[in-house]
């Protein structure tokens, strides 16, 4: 039509005439140029160098070259996920704090992340354990192993400064609990460092974990090796880059967490992107404590506390009101730990009951979360500081009241006594020096060797041995050493029959010859005659020599098997001695009374003796009570024997402080013994040491306690002696 218009404008209608009047035809389309011929890309062949140029690559380095070249043919894809690391940091700190105070060792971030990777695959994402292979005819196949075997990339620096990458394997990692995984991982690392890896140690990996984050790499896409379907990369644990230079107090106030980036590089032929994404989500969930991940880790390692839980921060715009409420909560938390911190202390060597966190000791009860741990609060002078981060406040309180020592003292009405105890335990380093540790070990050696000799030499004879409570010997030793160094004139000890022979020998100084003669029926004719266990009733006088060279006279009062009958006798003997010395209020003779837990709670003479302890006519300036807490009375469990929570509750009638201590921590036992003596000297009052332990052989050596307490004695039979445990710790 346009051509018709050009030939004769009147041949078209007026409307088309108007349209074509200023119409311009588009430029003629140009022909599409022919596509260039494809360029054939020849594979790049490394230049052939003369033999004198460069260095030959041999051994493990040559295998790395071969593996890297083989990895080029794998069609991989990579997913990333950034995970908040706050909870990971907090729970790891608790774990390592406990391990550092007990058997030693350290759990790394890689241990926890590696275990989370294994758990995520085995529980939720088994597809990530698949790998690609071909049959003999070249047909594609997929292999799905039943268990996860984790290869761990280890960067090893050689003596010449060069680095080598080794990937040993934790086999069947999905069948291990965390303790087993941790042990297998550490054994593998020991082999790497000792250069003792065998070819078998490199075989069988189904998944590989690499952690370049240890050298600061934020995230990585590692190479996937043939025969595997997944390699997981772990980036650095740090604040996001935009916050790295921020003030730590500001970071805490804003609730900014460190993050860790985890990558999943997978074989796209057998693993799909959605599966990789779900896998990484499960890893994040586990590292945030979902499904009791950290609780399981704590139980596997024997950590006797509840794991910290993930919670959302509460930090509104109206921060002043919120912080005021939190400040009040922190003050309440400090007081509650002083009153009830002993409830979560690690006191039971057997740990046959699951730990539980009372609501009043849980910061979450007061609206405090992990995000408040780095925020500063007023402390009221706790550990000599006016302002501390909440994490530091909890650290001070739990070190003082919730480790292997638990203290009951807030029932005391005198604020000076309360303040004195706080000054002795809050923010004070619990470590003993090496000489003290060696001396404690010597005392434990003597206690255990004595019992073992009697058990071997006099088979079948009753001796009411101290096995399970050997720490009582270092306790008595520490009290008497402090008394000797303080210049006291003497001490009188009263005790029941359990452990009496050990105390006679290792504390009072009775000779082995005398003890052995009594086992062989050669009883001293001057002693009170009897039959059966008469040797467990006898008293003895001796001299205790402290390491300083100072000495103190010690008398162990005779006592029949009426347990607490000796209590008023000992106190009366001490009062008579003090009156004879004729130094009013000097109280230079120290009474020490040992008790069984059931007898201390169950016999009325205990309460009667306590009740008279501060009456002017009967005062002796304070008795040190040592309760050998077997956690059972003959065959009766605590819940069937008393109404109180502790066997020592009766001592509260005189407002005596009570120090509960784990008998399998002899260092803590000695610290408590010294503290108890110092309290007695300072306030001239009774004080109680509750050594929580167990009886290895029942009421006496002729009993089989597993009939009445099978679960308890299954634990006891698995338990090594306190001497063995302390030797390993040292």
Task: Please name every model-derived segment.
Residues 217-220, 243-245, 348, 501-508, ...:
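Short acidic, glycine/serine/threonine-rich loops at helix termini
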Residues 492-655, 659-663:
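Cofactor-binding active-site loop characterized by glycine-rich and histidine/acidic residues
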Residues 8, 15-18, 25, 29, ...:
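C-terminal catalytic/motor cores of large multi-domain enzyme assemblies
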Residues 64, 449, 453-513:
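Active-site pocket-lining segments that scaffold enzyme catalytic pockets across diverse folds
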Residues 375, 379, 383, 514-525, ...:
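Phosphate/diphosphate-binding loops
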Residues 6, 50, 54, 269, ...:
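Hydrophobic alpha-helical scaffolding
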Residues 19-22, 203-209, 298-309, 350-355, ...:
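A glycine-rich phosphate-binding loop feature that marks nucleotide/adenosyl-phosphate handling sites
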Residues 23-44, 311-471, 488:
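Extended, charge-enriched "interface" segments that sit outside catalytic cores
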């Amino acid at each position: 039509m346009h051509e018709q218009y050009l030939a004769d404008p009147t041949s078209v209608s007026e409307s088309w005439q108007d349209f074509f009047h200023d119409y311009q035809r588009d430029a003629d389309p140009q022909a599409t140029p022919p596509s260039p011929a494809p360029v054939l890309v020849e594979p790049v062949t490394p230049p052939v160098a003369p033999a004198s140029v460069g260095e030959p690559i041999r051994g493990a380095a040559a295998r790395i070259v071969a593996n890297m070249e083989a990895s080029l043919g794998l069609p991989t894809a990579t997913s990333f996920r950034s995970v908040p690391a706050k909870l990971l940091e907090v729970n790891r700190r608790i774990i390592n704090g406990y391990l550092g105070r007990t058997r030693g060792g350290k759990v790394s971030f890689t241990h926890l992340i590696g275990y989370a990777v294994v758990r995520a695959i085995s529980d939720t994402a088994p597809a990530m354990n698949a790998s690609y292979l071909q049959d003999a005819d070249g047909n594609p196949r997929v292999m799905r192993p039943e268990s996860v075997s984790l290869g761990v990339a280890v960067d090893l620096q050689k003596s010449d400064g060069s680095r080598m990458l080794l990937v040993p394997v934790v086999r069947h990692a999905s069948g291990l609990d965390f303790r087993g995984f941790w042990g297998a991982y550490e054994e593998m690392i020991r082999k790497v460092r000792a250069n003792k890896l065998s070819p078998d140690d490199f075989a069988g990996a189904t998944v590989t974990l690499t952690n370049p984050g240890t050298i600061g790499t934020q995230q990585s896409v590692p190479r996937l090796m043939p025969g595997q379907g997944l390699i997981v990369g772990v980036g650095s644990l740090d604040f996001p880059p935009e916050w790295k230079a921020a003030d730590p107090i500001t970071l805490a106030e804003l609730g900014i967490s460190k993050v860790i980036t985890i990558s999943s590089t997978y074989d796209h032929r057998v693993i799909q992107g959605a599966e990789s994404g779900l896998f990484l989500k499960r890893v994040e969930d586990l590292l945030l404590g979902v499904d009791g991940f950290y609780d399981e880790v704590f139980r596997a390692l024997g950590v006797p506390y509840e794991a910290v839980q993930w919670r959302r921060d509460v930090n509104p715009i109206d921060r002043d009101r919120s912080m005021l409420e939190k400040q009040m909560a922190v003050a309440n938390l400090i007081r509650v730990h002083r009153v009830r911190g002993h409830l979560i202390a690690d006191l039971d060597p057997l740990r046959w009951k699951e730990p539980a966190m009372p609501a009043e000791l849980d910061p979450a009860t007061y609206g405090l979360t992990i995000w408040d741990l780095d925020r500063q609060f007023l402390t009221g002078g706790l550990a000599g500081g006016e302002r501390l981060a909440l994490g530091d406040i909890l650290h001070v309180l739990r070190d003082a009241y919730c480790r292997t020592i638990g203290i009951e003292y807030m029932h005391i009405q005198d604020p000076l006594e309360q303040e004195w105890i706080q000054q002795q335990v809050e923010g004070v380093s619990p470590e003993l020096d090496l000489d003290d540790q060696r001396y404690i070990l010597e005392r434990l050696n003597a206690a255990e060797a004595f019992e073992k000799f009697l058990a071997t030499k006099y088979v079948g004879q009753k001796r009411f041995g101290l096995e399970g409570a050997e720490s009582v010997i270092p306790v008595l030793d520490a009290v008497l050493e402090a008394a000797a160094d303080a210049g006291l004139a003497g001490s009188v000890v009263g005790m029941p029959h359990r452990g009496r022979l050990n105390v006679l020998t290792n504390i009072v100084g009775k000779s082995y010859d005398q003890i052995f003669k009594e086992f062989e029926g050669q009883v001293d004719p001057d002693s009170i005659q009897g039959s059966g266990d008469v040797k467990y009733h006898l008293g003895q006088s001796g001299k205790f020599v402290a390491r300083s060279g100072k000495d103190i006279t010690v008398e162990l009062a005779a006592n029949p098997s009426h347990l607490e009958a000796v209590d008023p006798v000992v106190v009366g003997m001490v009062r008579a001695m003090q009156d004879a010395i004729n130094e009013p209020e000097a109280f230079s003779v120290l009474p020490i009374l040992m008790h069984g837990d059931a007898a201390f709670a169950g016999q009325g003479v205990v309460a009667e003796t306590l009740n008279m302890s501060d009456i002017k006519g009967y005062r002796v300036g304070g008795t040190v009570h040592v309760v050998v807490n077997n956690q059972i009375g003959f065959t009766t469990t605590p819940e069937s024997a008393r109404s109180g929570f502790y066997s020592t509750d009766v001592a509260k009638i005189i407002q005596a402080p009570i120090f509960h201590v784990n008998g399998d921590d002899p260092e803590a036992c000695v610290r408590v013994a010294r503290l108890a003596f110092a309290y007695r000297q300072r306030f001239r009052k009774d004080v109680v040491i509750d050594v929580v332990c167990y009886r290895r052989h029942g009421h006496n050596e002729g009993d089989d306690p597993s009939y009445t307490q099978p679960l308890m004695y299954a634990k006891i039979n698995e338990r090594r002696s306190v001497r063995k445990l302390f030797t390993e710790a040292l």
